Amino acid sequence: RYRLTILVRGLSDGFDDEAWVTQIARPYMYELCNELVWPIAIATLSGSTMLIRQTTDHRSPLAVEKRGPGFRVAILGSASGIAYLTWCPKEQRDALLDLLAKSKRTEDQSAANRKKVNDLLLETRKRGYAAWRRPRRVSDELSLSVPILAGERLLASLTIRFSSTAVPEAEAIRRFIPRLRATAQRIGE
C-alpha cells in the first residue's frame, strides 16, 4: 500500500494540519498502539497550548482517562509541550516563553523562571525525549514525547501515556522511546 509523505502532501492545495494527521500519521499511530497497547497522541501548537490532533485512546484498553482530538494541554505542563518547546526554532521558543510568562494560568507560571525552563529544555534535548509525571490518586501517569520532524521543520509531538505502577519509568524509556522515535521518523518522512 502506498502513502503520500509529509513533504509531498505539503505541495498539494488545501493541505492542513488535520489532513496530515488523519491521512498520514493515524495508520502509524494505530500500529504503534497495537504494539505497545498504551495510548498514543499527536499534539501541535495552538496558540499558547498544545492541541491534541489525534489519539488512540479509543483503541487502547489501558487509556484510563479518554482524551480525544481537541483536548488541550499546557505547554510547560505536558511532555508534548516540553518536546515542542525543545525542538522549535529559538525565536518561536523565546516568543512562546514570553507569552507564557505573562499568562494568568497557573500551569504557565513556571515560564517566568527562564533559567529553570532553559535547563529543562537542554536536558530534554540531551536525552532526546521529553518526560512528564502527572500525579493521580492511584498511580501517577507518565508521558514520554518525541518531536515529529519533516527535515528540519518541527511538525508536532508524538506522545505515549502510561501508568507508573504498571511500567516503571526506566523500563518505559527502554521499551517505548526507540519505538516512538521510529514512528515519529516514519510520520515525518
Stretches with model-predicted labels:
Residues 148-151:
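Sensor-regulatory modules in signal-transduction proteins
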Residues 55-57, 135, 159-160:
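Short clusters of small/polar residues that mark proteolytic maturation junctions
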Residues 25-32, 97-145, 189:
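Short, basic/aromatic recognition patches
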Residues 3-99:
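Amphipathic alpha-helical effector-binding/dimerization core
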Residues 41, 143-145, 157:
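Short glycine-aspartate micro-motif
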Residues 127, 138-140, 155-189:
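Juxtadomain coupling helices with adjacent low-complexity linkers
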Residues 8-11, 102-103, 163-167:
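A short, flexible beta-alpha/helix-coil linker loop
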Residues 37, 93, 126-130, 185:
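Generic structural signal for secondary-structure transition and capping sites
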